[in-house]
UniProtKB/Swiss-Prot annotation:
Record carries keyword Isomerase: yes
EC number, UniProt record: 5.1.3.9
GO BP terms in the entry: carbohydrate metabolic process; N-acetylmannosamine catabolic process; N-acetylneuraminate catabolic process
SUPFAM superfamilies (UniProt xref): Ribulose-phoshate binding barrel
Pfam family, one: NanE
Reactions catalysed, as given in the entry: an N-acyl-D-glucosamine 6-phosphate = an N-acyl-D-mannosamine 6-phosphate
Pathway participation: Amino-sugar metabolism; N-acetylneuraminate degradation; D-fructose 6-phosphate from N-acetylneuraminate: step 3/5
Domain of life where this protein originates: Bacteria
Protein name as catalogued: Putative N-acetylmannosamine-6-phosphate 2-epimerase
Task of the protein: Converts N-acetylmannosamine-6-phosphate (ManNAc-6-P) to N-acetylglucosamine-6-phosphate (GlcNAc-6-P).
Family: Belongs to the NanE family.
Organism of origin: Streptococcus sanguinis (strain SK36)
Length: 232
Protein backbone atom coordinates (compact mmCIF):
# COMPACT_ATOMS: atom_id res chain seq x y z
CA UNK A 1 0.00 0.00 0.00
CA UNK A 2 1.05 3.59 -0.47
CA UNK A 3 3.20 4.93 2.34
CA UNK A 4 2.63 8.63 1.64
CA UNK A 5 2.46 10.73 4.78
CA UNK A 6 -0.71 12.66 5.46
CA UNK A 7 1.06 16.03 5.52
CA UNK A 8 2.77 15.25 2.21
CA UNK A 9 -0.56 14.40 0.61
CA UNK A 10 -2.16 17.59 1.94
CA UNK A 11 0.69 19.61 0.45
CA UNK A 12 -0.04 18.06 -2.95
CA UNK A 13 -3.82 18.58 -2.97
CA UNK A 14 -4.67 21.56 -0.76
CA UNK A 15 -4.68 24.27 -3.43
CA UNK A 16 -6.08 22.35 -6.37
CA UNK A 17 -8.91 20.23 -7.68
CA UNK A 18 -9.18 16.47 -7.34
CA UNK A 19 -11.21 15.17 -10.27
CA UNK A 20 -13.54 12.22 -9.81
CA UNK A 21 -13.36 10.04 -12.92
CA UNK A 22 -16.03 7.36 -12.80
CA UNK A 23 -18.58 5.66 -15.02
CA UNK A 24 -21.04 3.09 -13.73
CA UNK A 25 -22.52 0.35 -15.95
CA UNK A 26 -25.72 2.30 -16.64
CA UNK A 27 -23.84 5.44 -17.74
CA UNK A 28 -22.85 6.40 -21.33
CA UNK A 29 -19.07 6.43 -20.75
CA UNK A 30 -19.00 2.91 -19.29
CA UNK A 31 -17.62 0.12 -21.45
CA UNK A 32 -17.04 -3.52 -20.60
CA UNK A 33 -13.66 -3.32 -22.32
CA UNK A 34 -12.47 -0.38 -20.21
CA UNK A 35 -10.06 2.23 -21.50
CA UNK A 36 -12.34 5.27 -21.27
CA UNK A 37 -11.63 6.41 -17.71
CA UNK A 38 -7.85 6.72 -18.22
CA UNK A 39 -8.58 9.17 -21.05
CA UNK A 40 -10.65 11.30 -18.68
CA UNK A 41 -7.78 11.15 -16.19
CA UNK A 42 -5.26 12.30 -18.79
CA UNK A 43 -7.52 15.22 -19.71
CA UNK A 44 -7.97 16.13 -16.04
CA UNK A 45 -4.23 16.04 -15.40
CA UNK A 46 -3.51 18.18 -18.46
CA UNK A 47 -6.09 20.63 -17.13
CA UNK A 48 -4.25 20.92 -13.82
CA UNK A 49 -5.91 18.36 -11.54
CA UNK A 50 -3.90 17.54 -8.41
CA UNK A 51 -5.51 14.17 -7.71
CA UNK A 52 -8.03 11.61 -8.92
CA UNK A 53 -10.95 9.88 -7.24
CA UNK A 54 -11.82 6.60 -8.94
CA UNK A 55 -14.02 3.54 -8.58
CA UNK A 56 -13.21 -0.14 -9.12
CA UNK A 57 -10.09 -2.24 -9.29
CA UNK A 58 -10.07 -2.25 -13.10
CA UNK A 59 -10.34 1.51 -13.47
CA UNK A 60 -7.72 2.23 -10.83
CA UNK A 61 -5.25 -0.19 -12.41
CA UNK A 62 -5.75 1.48 -15.77
CA UNK A 63 -5.46 4.94 -14.23
CA UNK A 64 -2.15 4.10 -12.56
CA UNK A 65 -0.74 3.28 -16.00
CA UNK A 66 -1.28 6.86 -17.20
CA UNK A 67 -0.71 9.07 -14.15
CA UNK A 68 1.23 9.36 -10.92
CA UNK A 69 -1.30 11.74 -9.35
CA UNK A 70 -2.56 10.77 -5.88
CA UNK A 71 -5.62 8.53 -6.03
CA UNK A 72 -8.61 8.33 -3.71
CA UNK A 73 -9.98 4.88 -4.38
CA UNK A 74 -13.42 3.43 -3.80
CA UNK A 75 -15.33 0.34 -4.82
CA UNK A 76 -19.05 0.77 -5.37
CA UNK A 77 -20.76 -2.54 -4.68
CA UNK A 78 -24.39 -2.96 -3.69
CA UNK A 79 -25.35 -5.02 -0.65
CA UNK A 80 -29.16 -4.91 -0.61
CA UNK A 81 -31.23 -4.36 1.40
CA UNK A 82 -28.61 -2.23 3.18
CA UNK A 83 -27.96 1.16 1.56
CA UNK A 84 -24.19 1.72 2.01
CA UNK A 85 -22.35 0.80 -1.20
CA UNK A 86 -19.11 2.82 -1.21
CA UNK A 87 -16.32 0.53 0.07
CA UNK A 88 -18.91 -0.96 2.39
CA UNK A 89 -17.03 -3.99 3.77
CA UNK A 90 -13.53 -5.28 4.41
CA UNK A 91 -13.70 -7.15 1.10
CA UNK A 92 -13.55 -3.84 -0.79
CA UNK A 93 -10.87 -2.44 1.52
CA UNK A 94 -8.69 -5.49 0.85
CA UNK A 95 -9.10 -5.07 -2.91
CA UNK A 96 -8.17 -1.38 -2.74
CA UNK A 97 -5.27 -1.86 -0.33
CA UNK A 98 -3.66 -4.21 -2.85
CA UNK A 99 -3.58 -1.42 -5.46
CA UNK A 100 -1.02 0.81 -3.70
CA UNK A 101 -3.13 3.97 -3.67
CA UNK A 102 -2.82 6.99 -1.44
CA UNK A 103 -6.32 7.10 0.10
CA UNK A 104 -9.16 4.64 0.56
CA UNK A 105 -12.60 6.19 1.01
CA UNK A 106 -15.29 4.41 3.04
CA UNK A 107 -19.00 4.88 3.66
CA UNK A 108 -19.09 6.15 7.24
CA UNK A 109 -22.76 7.08 7.47
CA UNK A 110 -24.90 5.89 10.37
CA UNK A 111 -27.02 3.66 8.13
CA UNK A 112 -27.30 -0.06 8.77
CA UNK A 113 -24.31 -1.90 7.34
CA UNK A 114 -24.16 -5.21 5.48
CA UNK A 115 -21.40 -6.52 7.76
CA UNK A 116 -23.38 -5.73 10.90
CA UNK A 117 -20.56 -3.64 12.36
CA UNK A 118 -20.77 -0.15 13.72
CA UNK A 119 -18.86 2.42 11.68
CA UNK A 120 -16.42 2.85 14.56
CA UNK A 121 -15.70 -0.88 14.74
CA UNK A 122 -15.27 -1.09 10.96
CA UNK A 123 -12.79 1.79 10.92
CA UNK A 124 -10.85 0.31 13.82
CA UNK A 125 -10.62 -3.05 12.06
CA UNK A 126 -9.31 -1.36 8.93
CA UNK A 127 -6.75 0.61 10.96
CA UNK A 128 -5.50 -2.57 12.60
CA UNK A 129 -5.18 -4.41 9.30
CA UNK A 130 -3.74 -1.47 7.33
CA UNK A 131 -2.19 0.89 9.90
CA UNK A 132 -0.35 3.05 7.35
CA UNK A 133 -3.20 3.46 4.87
CA UNK A 134 -4.79 6.92 4.72
CA UNK A 135 -8.56 6.76 5.09
CA UNK A 136 -11.32 9.14 4.03
CA UNK A 137 -14.77 8.94 5.60
CA UNK A 138 -17.62 9.63 3.19
CA UNK A 139 -20.26 11.20 5.45
CA UNK A 140 -23.53 13.12 5.24
CA UNK A 141 -23.70 14.92 8.61
CA UNK A 142 -21.46 16.59 11.17
CA UNK A 143 -22.14 13.85 13.72
CA UNK A 144 -21.02 11.15 11.30
CA UNK A 145 -17.83 13.06 10.61
CA UNK A 146 -17.05 13.51 14.30
CA UNK A 147 -17.60 9.82 14.98
CA UNK A 148 -15.37 8.79 12.08
CA UNK A 149 -12.56 11.11 13.18
CA UNK A 150 -12.77 9.75 16.70
CA UNK A 151 -12.51 6.23 15.29
CA UNK A 152 -9.33 7.12 13.43
CA UNK A 153 -9.95 8.29 9.85
CA UNK A 154 -7.59 10.84 8.36
CA UNK A 155 -10.03 12.87 6.26
CA UNK A 156 -13.76 13.50 6.22
CA UNK A 157 -15.53 13.96 2.90
CA UNK A 158 -18.93 15.56 2.46
CA UNK A 159 -19.61 13.15 -0.39
CA UNK A 160 -22.92 11.83 0.88
CA UNK A 161 -24.59 15.00 2.12
CA UNK A 162 -27.97 15.05 0.42
CA UNK A 163 -27.76 11.37 -0.45
CA UNK A 164 -28.97 9.96 2.86
CA UNK A 165 -32.61 10.22 3.89
CA UNK A 166 -31.77 12.40 6.90
CA UNK A 167 -29.30 14.91 5.40
CA UNK A 168 -30.30 18.26 3.83
CA UNK A 169 -31.35 18.21 0.18
CA UNK A 170 -29.81 21.22 -1.55
CA UNK A 171 -29.05 21.95 -5.20
CA UNK A 172 -25.36 22.47 -4.67
CA UNK A 173 -22.61 21.75 -2.15
CA UNK A 174 -23.46 21.67 1.55
CA UNK A 175 -21.52 24.81 2.39
CA UNK A 176 -22.76 24.99 5.96
CA UNK A 177 -21.62 21.43 6.70
CA UNK A 178 -18.23 22.11 5.14
CA UNK A 179 -17.85 25.31 7.16
CA UNK A 180 -18.80 23.58 10.41
CA UNK A 181 -16.39 20.70 9.82
CA UNK A 182 -13.53 23.10 9.06
CA UNK A 183 -14.30 25.17 12.14
CA UNK A 184 -14.13 21.99 14.22
CA UNK A 185 -10.58 21.43 12.99
CA UNK A 186 -11.29 18.33 10.91
CA UNK A 187 -9.27 17.61 7.77
CA UNK A 188 -12.02 18.09 5.20
CA UNK A 189 -12.10 16.95 1.59
CA UNK A 190 -15.15 18.69 0.17
CA UNK A 191 -17.14 16.70 -2.35
CA UNK A 192 -20.64 16.60 -3.71
CA UNK A 193 -22.65 18.83 -6.06
CA UNK A 194 -19.81 21.27 -6.70
CA UNK A 195 -21.00 22.46 -10.10
CA UNK A 196 -19.19 25.77 -10.66
CA UNK A 197 -15.69 27.24 -10.16
CA UNK A 198 -17.15 29.95 -7.92
CA UNK A 199 -18.40 27.26 -5.53
CA UNK A 200 -14.98 25.61 -5.49
CA UNK A 201 -13.34 28.95 -4.65
CA UNK A 202 -15.83 29.60 -1.85
CA UNK A 203 -15.15 26.15 -0.42
CA UNK A 204 -11.38 26.51 -0.76
CA UNK A 205 -11.50 29.72 1.25
CA UNK A 206 -13.19 27.88 4.14
CA UNK A 207 -9.93 26.02 4.77
CA UNK A 208 -10.57 22.56 3.38
CA UNK A 209 -7.69 20.16 2.73
CA UNK A 210 -8.97 19.19 -0.70
CA UNK A 211 -11.83 19.59 -3.16
CA UNK A 212 -13.27 16.82 -5.33
CA UNK A 213 -15.25 17.71 -8.45
CA UNK A 214 -16.83 14.96 -10.49
CA UNK A 215 -19.97 15.33 -12.55
CA UNK A 216 -19.31 18.95 -13.51
CA UNK A 217 -16.11 17.83 -15.26
CA UNK A 218 -16.37 14.17 -16.25
CA UNK A 219 -20.06 13.43 -16.84
CA UNK A 220 -21.03 15.02 -20.19
CA UNK A 221 -24.62 13.78 -19.94
CA UNK A 222 -25.03 15.61 -16.62
CA UNK A 223 -23.34 18.74 -17.96
CA UNK A 224 -25.60 18.75 -21.02
CA UNK A 225 -28.71 18.32 -18.87
CA UNK A 226 -27.71 21.34 -16.79
CA UNK A 227 -27.39 23.53 -19.90
CA UNK A 228 -30.66 22.23 -21.35
CA UNK A 229 -32.48 22.90 -18.08
CA UNK A 230 -31.04 26.40 -18.02
CA UNK A 231 -32.93 27.26 -21.19
CA UNK A 232 -36.31 26.33 -19.74
Amino acid sequence: MSQILKDDLIAKIKDGIIVSCQALPQEPLYTEAGGVIPLLVKAAEQGGAVGIRANSVRDIREIKEVTSLPIIGIIKRDYPPQEPFITATMREVDELAALDIEVIALDCTKRERHDGLTVADFIKQVKVKYPHQLLMADISTYEEAAAAVEAGVDFVGTTLSGYTSYSPKVDGPDIELIRRLCQAGFDVIAEGKIHYPSQAKQIHDLGVRGIVVGGAITRPKEITERFVAGLK
